Amino acid sequence: MLGDVLNTQELLTLATAIEGHPDNVAPALLGGLTSSVFEDGKVYSVKRNVDETLCFAAIVPDYKLLTEAARAALPKEVSHKDAVYNLSRAALVPAAFCEGRHDLLAIATEDKLHQPYRMPLMPGSKEVFDMARLCGAKAVYVSGAGSTVMAVAEKAEAEKFYSKLEKGLELLEGLDGCEAFTLLRLDADNTGATVE
């Protein structure tokens, strides 16, 4: 990454010390799908390449959701049942996104720990979820703390998916306090940060 200056581990640790969240730093630096933990001043991170037959739609509303407000919406405690629900689905994420198991995408992205609490702060988000599924999304989820919603589709159907989603989002404009949505067509970046 930075050649002789810093190795990848040193760069991850330094960037996490500055930014504070290895789950933000690792994917930006490494690309792909990452799992990361910051423990005793060190980042432990695993990277896998995202299946290149997938495409992504970032659906960005015209309002901002402050991270502080999104964090404050989360409960201080969660039930054991909800924790197990999320952990079991998180275990499916690598197979769904990296091993071509598209049949697992929807269930792997189901959530009971943050989306039910944050979506009420995101006007129109439930309708966006429903519209994306109606347009052919294999999975839909809140990106980070919100307010962006991500939808996942198969590249073989990308043009049809994006076209239908664009038209569908136009129908949702003005709904529930959201005047407009921006649709970003994305592919996974399995390379991460580079220096030229």
Predicted regions and their residues:
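Glycine-rich, charge-dense phosphate/pyrophosphate-binding loop(s)
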Residues: 97-196
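Solvent-exposed alpha-helices and their adjacent loops that cap or buttress functional pockets
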Residues: 18-20, 26-29, 47-52, 85-86, ...
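Short beta-strand scaffold segments in enzyme catalytic cores
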Residues: 25-28, 33-36, 57, 149-151, ...
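A glycine/threonine-rich phosphate-anchoring loop and its flanking beta-alpha core
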Residues: 36-46, 50-69
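Gly/Ser-rich oxyanion-binding loop with an adjacent helix/lid
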Residues: 1-44
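Active-site rim beta-loop-alpha module in soluble metabolic enzymes
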Residues: 57-120
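Short beta-strand segments
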Residues: 28-31, 37, 58-62, 142-144, ...
